Amino acid sequence: MNKSSTKTLIALSMMAVSSGVSAHGYVSETNDGIAGSRAALCKFPTSDTQEKNRDCGAVQWEPQSVEGPEGFPEKGPADGQIAGAGLVQFSELNEQTADRWVKRPITAGAQTFEWTFTANHVTRTWKYYMTKQNWNPNAVLTRDSFDLTPFCELEYNMEKPPLYPNTFSHECIVPEREGYQVILAVWDVGDTAAAFYNVIDVKFDGNGGVVDPTWSQGGQINPTRDLNVGDRVFTRVFDTSGENASLSTELVIENETQGQANNWTHALATKINKEQQNIGAGQLNDKGEFSPQYGSNPVYLKAGSGLKSVEIGYQLETVEPVYHLDIEGLASEYTIGDSATELDLSLYATGDMNVELTVYNHGKEALANTNVTLKDGEAKSVVMALSKSEKGHHMLVSRIKNMDGELIKQDMSDFHLVEEAVTPPPSGDFDFVFPEGVKGYKAGTKVLAEDGNVYQCKEFPYSGYCVQWTETATNFAPGVGSDWSMAWDKVN
């Protein structure tokens, strides 16, 4: 039963611990986090059950970039687009049904939320919102889905949290709920007009939870891949003596439709329930009945059976090709000069592939793009000239496709453009920086010229040339004018 939530305002304490990933930030469960975000679980499997969200689109390559307008709930992403932060490229995150996403177990009370930051912006606050107990899990997320009073709000006084490979954790008091709920975590940064939106799919004990004590989860069927006709997928059952092959359930893929990831997982769970007495697969209700799902299916073991765990094995008819791209030569910083900034890169391919490289600035404006075809083992050099060079954070996005045009992998690397440090002019050995005070120059006057050198005005009668300068008549300009040597002597 839903109870009124308590809002927690906490002074932060940092726990910097080792992590692993690659440009902004997301809710993670790498170390001590209670649950990873929907976006994070599109890229990284859970640590215990190895579950992973599927069919996520582009966010599987960059869960750290779910960034939208700040100001939630008064402003921010529109209703129906909250999970994807209003970004078209992350629209898959906005899909919402009771069984669409992996759910992480949680209980009310003190819980640790963990963030991984790949660009550590200065921070105003973190805020956490929870869906109402009576929300509709089969309707897109709107403001009406949530209790708009954050149950946890944390100030950070415009400081920067620790950067990857460290994680950052803080504690919140989670209100009581039952069953499937969604937490919305909002990271409000202080150096842009944006915020990062991470929804977290969680499941509380209570209605919809496992209430039959005779069953405990011993494994998970995850829709990790599509299978081909003739491929085999099977359970590997372990008891106190090791693997028990006699309890294995095997499914042979008979057609292309059955080979789709969400379909074969449902079919395998159904077959397990028909063949096994001490193993069940799917959602377990309070009557002890299993309902196979089109997608992830928990695998349960009966108490007293002596069974310990279940793993999933594959026997594939075809060997999948290996693809890998190494990009060398990308610097962490480039100094802005008079000419266009250039990235001089070297590409090394494993597998035949088409590579698309795009450079974006922090505002996600494309500044350069190139396409390269590489054969297995081939290396090529690429020079990318940026259309404009402004200081700040930039990103190089690489997309690898096979020769059929199917996306294999997308990666993103960060770099920064910085302004060239201005060397202060030497002090104490000149009177003016030319052409300051030009009409007052006389014999012996020393000036710092445009070329960085110091010049001294000649003695009479040549000193009269030193004052003969305008923006359109520059022939006596020291060091650079066509007749400068008639008026000036170079000092250094």
Swiss-Prot record:
The gene is gbpA. The lineage of its organism: Bacteria, Pseudomonadati, Pseudomonadota, Gammaproteobacteria, Vibrionales. Gene3D superfamilies: 2.60.40.2550, 3.30.70.2150, chitin-binding protein cbp21. PANTHER family: CHITIN-BINDING TYPE-4 DOMAIN-CONTAINING PROTEIN, GLCNAC-BINDING PROTEIN A. Residues 24-204 form the Chitin-binding type-4 domain. One of its GO terms (cellular component) is extracellular region. CDD domains: LPMO_AA10. Residues 1-23 form the signal peptide. This is GlcNAc-binding protein A. It is found in: Secreted. Residues 443-484 form the Chitin-binding type-3 domain. GO terms for molecular function: chitin binding. Pfam families: GbpA_2, GbpA_D3, LPMO_10. Probably interacts with GlcNAc residues. May promote attachment to both epithelial cell surfaces and chitin. Keywords: Chitin-binding, Secreted, Signal. Belongs to the GbpA family.
